[in-house]
Amino acid sequence: MLNQHTSSVPDDEHLQMAHQNSSSEVRNEAAVPDQLLTPLQPYTILLKDGETIATMYPIPAYPDLLPLGLLNFLLDEFNMEVEKGDSFPYYETLSLEEFKNVWFHNDGHVCIMVLGEIPELDYSMDTEADTNDNFGTEIETTKHTTQYKKRKERRNLNLSMQWEKQCLGIFDLKPAYPGRSAHVVTGTFLVNAGIRGKGIGKTLMETFIEWSKKLGFTSSFFPLIYGTNVGIRRILEGLNFRRIGKLPEAGILKGFDVPVDSFMYGKEFTHITKSIDLLRDPQKSIEIGKYERLKHFLETGKYPLHCDRNEKARLRVLSKTHSVLNGKLMTKGKEIIYDTDQQIQIALEIHLMEHLGINKVTSKIGEKYHWRGIKSTVSEVISRCQKCKMRYKDGTGVIIEQKRAVKQAHMLPTQHIETINNPRKSKKHDNALLGQAINFPQNIISSTLNDVEGEPTPPDTNIVQPTFQNATNSPATTAEANEANKRSEFLSSIQSTPLLDDEQSMNSFNRFVEEENSRKRRKYLDVASNGIVPHLTNNESQDHANPVNRDERDMNHSVPDLDRNDHTIMNDAMLSLEDNVMAALEMVQKEQQQKINHRGEDVTGQQIDLNNSEGNENSVTKIVNNESNTFTEHNSNIYY
């Protein structure tokens, strides 16, 4: 699995070759053996400025394959970090030989990142697929030009360059353990101190992962990452490296009175677990770094290294609400847990006590601990609980997705007349109507009762055209015909209206019901004023002029505009009205009968009876209007 082609070169031969190269004034390595070539290809990228091109060259881990000036520059950079005393475990600076032993492993590789392209550092094998091996980028390179190939074949390592401006960074790639654990890779990273903060470290780490996979490594392990090294920790956690463990007080660093903790990070290349991606979002690494710096500031009273003004101000503000108690970061009496593994462990322990639900476990955790996304962590833990899976199997619930408007049931109005316990007070009507007698034309009542006793109102599209049966001699024939024509036009306009959606259709239906109720109410008033009252007044005036023929006219033509069958309909209509209406009608009929019996009385007596009749009929007008309002209120009291 692991490509160990570099181990075929014996150490004696390697030392002999190094001795020969050191004794020659010109280091010409044109004839490089195939054992020193690598299957990895150079990787050219575009830096953040969008213009500068940089190339990372994979080189087999032999120091003699590098220019001497480049080795000296790398040694100076490494010793500079050693002198800082906050990243590497060395007390003293290293010599060139010690540096070679640390960085160059026989079974490993070294990556040199430089500006532009330097063909002398290209130790890759010539393959047919190398044109597509630039990680899918479309950056144009000079790798296939004649000049590049000539410089690669010549390989003059005595290059006079300013490596402090040309070299951007370096990392080594080697097995973490020998033999049976040689498939685990580790490495060391170093970025040019003059150009840090440009994203070069993250680019080197990403390339480290890609090349490790190509060389056959299955996992990566970094055993000693100091807690104060915030930069590398952000990069590792941002690339889904798992923090495997912590080694307390593992580093005695400069600027710290007490030893600091170190952390171990690891990542699987072939068996990536779900917990890394599901429980660690891009903001998680930022949160961890924030709490680590805050804890360091509270414990030591000193700002962490490489903190800008905004970071220092933020630490001062957070120090007022946070504290360290027995090595634990606290806020408002709760312990802050920013370690992902510890968060999962706490949620699992509380859940396993009684196998509680998400909300109860979240509440119990919130009593003692604090971290961002407690509910998400609890949800992930409960989803893995086998006992809860057996208790609550999938598919027991029903999930409804609202994709369109749900049609609602609506009640259609029915024209049944019911008694209202508390009828609404009748409104004031025109004074001209109060002084006139009222009688009901049976054709109008018949049409109304047919609507009352029928089925519920049909839909708009199936409305039956109404018909009116009027006597030819009725004084209200013309008015009713006009009313019927208006209603026919109104219904035809409704039928011709295009169908709307549910809500608009119900609004149109509501307006139709309101207009229909108001129309029926106006019909009662129009009939009372135009058809019945003039008829009665005309009869009364004729009776005064010719009292002899009045009996014969009343007996033969009691109501001229009604036929014989309408008397039965009139009686049925009277039975459905209120008792007070019946009493009023009986009183009117009694008064009329008295007038017929006393037709021989003098004119003064007849005038008094007529005034009494008109007064009673005025009361009937009020009662009928009140009942009409009650009927309208009943029809309008429909819920939608």
Swiss-Prot record:
Consequence of gene loss (knockout): Decreases HTA1 RNA level.
Residue ranges, annotated region (Disordered): 1-30, 534-565
Gene Ontology molecular functions: acyltransferase activity, transferring groups other than amino-acyl groups; promoter-specific chromatin binding; sequence-specific DNA binding
Listed Basic and acidic residues bias regions: 549-565
Annotated N-acetyltransferase domain residues: 121-259
InterPro entries the record matches: Acyl_CoA_acyltransferase, GNAT_dom, Mito_N-acetyltransferase, Znf_H2C2_histone_UAS-bd
GO process annotations (BP): DNA repair; negative regulation of autophagy; negative regulation of transcription by RNA polymerase II; rDNA heterochromatin formation; silent mating-type cassette heterochromatin formation; subtelomeric heterochromatin formation
GO cellular component terms, A-Z: chromosome, telomeric region; nucleus
Annotated function: Required for normal transcription at a number of loci in yeast. Affects transcription at Ty1 elements, at PHO5, STE6 and ADH2.
Miscellaneous: Present with 1500 molecules/cell in log phase SD medium.
Record-given protein name: Protein SPT10
Species in which this protein is naturally found: Saccharomyces cerevisiae (strain ATCC 204508 / S288c)
